[in-house]
Amino acid sequence: MKAQDLREKNVEELNEELLNLLREQFNLRMQAATGQLQQTHTLKAVRRDIARVKTLLNEKAGA
């Protein structure tokens, strides 16, 4: 997910995206814990996407 795409969204859409990413992260962590996760790099990518969304939410809250 690109930061430019996220910047075009409003706060409500970003909150929805954050919720979806947190759910996805939870599911990936459960798969990793049970040994079902084949592509472990997806955990890192989702974690960074969450950070991007949170950063943009903080920027929009300050503006």
UniProtKB/Swiss-Prot annotation:
InterPro entries: Ribosomal_protein_uL29, Ribosomal_uL29, Ribosomal_uL29_CS, Ribosomal_uL29_sf. It comes from the Bacteria. It holds the Pfam family Ribosomal_L29. The lineage of its organism: Bacteria, Pseudomonadati, Pseudomonadota, Gammaproteobacteria, Vibrionales. Belongs to the universal ribosomal protein uL29 family. Coiled coil: none annotated. NCBIfam families: L29 (TIGR00012). This is Large ribosomal subunit protein uL29. One of its GO terms (cellular component) is cytosolic large ribosomal subunit.
